Structures are given as C-alpha cells and as structure tokens.
Amino acid sequence: MRKVLIVLISVIFMVGCARVPATQAPAKPELVIDTFLQALSRGDVDTCISLLADDVVFRQEPSGIKLEGKAPFEESLRRVTTWHPQYSIVSPIKVNGDKVAFSAKLSEDDFKILGLEYVNADFEIQVWEGKIKSWVTIVNQADWKRLTELTAGGIGVKIEFVEQGMRIKELAGNSPAYEAGIRSGDVITAVNGVSYSQMREGEMQLRIQGPVGTKVKLTVTHEGAPTPVDIEVTRVSLEQLRY
C-alpha cells in the first residue's frame, strides 16, 4: 500500500500557464509541464505519456522509489487520475535552463480517506527538447512521517478480489482479524459502512489500513453463511505480523 501511496502523491500540480500549441516544438520547459499537468487533471493520460521522454526517470524521496521508462510511469499516472488530485503552488516557479523547480500542496481523495487534507512536496523536473526527461518529488519529512503513521496498521490477512468484495486467502499467525473471528474464505464486503461496490481500485485496502491501535469495522460474510455480520478489528503494526 505504501508504495502505491508514494506514486499517488508524486506526479502533478497546476501551474497556470498557457497551453502549448501542438505545432510548437521544442516548447519551453514550464509550458511542457503545464500542458502535462492540465492533461493529467482532465484524466488525459495519453497526452501525458506523449510528453514523456522514452528514458524518463521518476524518483521520490524520502522513500527512494524510482521508476525508469514510460511504462511504469504510465501505470502510476493511470492510478493517480482515479483519486482526483488537486494542487496548490506555494512557491515561485524557478526555471534554470531545462530544469523547473517549485513547491506545492497536494490534495487527493486517498489522502482524505486516510484523514490527511494534503501533503507538501518540492518538485525538480527536467525537460529536454520538449519532453519530460526526469521528475523528482521530495515529500516534506513531517508529512511523510504522518503518511507512514496513517498506513502503519493492518489486520493481518492476505486477500484476493471477488465480485462481492475481498476474500480472505490467508491469515497471519498473530492476526487480529483471526482473533476477531474472521477466517479463510470469508469475504469482506464493506469497511466502516462503505460498500465495496462504491469503492475504486485499491480503496478497500486503503480503508482497512490505519494508525496502529485504532479500530476498523468490517462487514463480513462468513463462508457458507446467508447474511453478513459486522466485526470490529483493532489494527496492529504491519511489521509485527507473521505469515
């Protein structure tokens, strides 16, 4: 989950410059970035991909996450658009040759689900001959710590997705889900009253995770049972789970 979240927070903001006409090439770096970000805010991932160099490199700190090439970047962009990102620039946009730098507040639906309105991050982007060649996101240390805390707890299960929700495949030996009465073959159909049918890809796992020691209410259909039941589980540190 954490890696997902790292990609989700790392790829867009709004600059507010004029869009680059398709006939202009190479465009100024700040205009290329603006076109990229406007397209991404509309969910137009294809336009975003067209503005990436074939050997584009994405890096995020302090996690050390690194993506190389268009394919992994495209995958992360398609995930990002499902969370309706909103960005607010909080510093002057600095342009030095082919490099652009700025700071922004990032707000996304996934952050709000976790209970965080936004994170602060610095961006360093290189544009070469009209294509984005490198993208570095440096998340504010305090915000990164908070994100880590908000996703540090879990219920100790391995899962697979089915039409009705999330089926339990395996439970950790010290799983709090097992202690609460959940067994292999059970299906989680809702989290804290939110139905699986209303969720986006990855949202159920996100809602199940949370700070260590907090409680999550799961609606569970036991294998072979006709009706679901609500079960409350206390999250434990993911690091202490043993499979």
Model-identified regions with their sequence ranges:
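PDZ-domain C-terminal substructure recognizer with occasional recognition of PDZ-binding tails
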Residues: 164-167, 189, 203-243
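Low-complexity, intrinsically disordered terminal/linker segments enriched in charged
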Residues: 133-152
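Conserved PDZ fold ligand-binding element
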Residues: 177-200
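Surface-exposed, charged secondary-structure patches
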Residues: 71-116, 124
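PDZ/PDZ-like groove recognition
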Residues: 151-177, 181-184
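Short, low-complexity N-terminal intrinsically disordered segments enriched in polar/charged residues
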Residues: 17-42, 46, 50
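A short gly/proline-enriched turn/hairpin at secondary-structure junctions
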Residues: 51, 57-68
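Bacterial N-terminal signal peptides
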Residues: 7-16
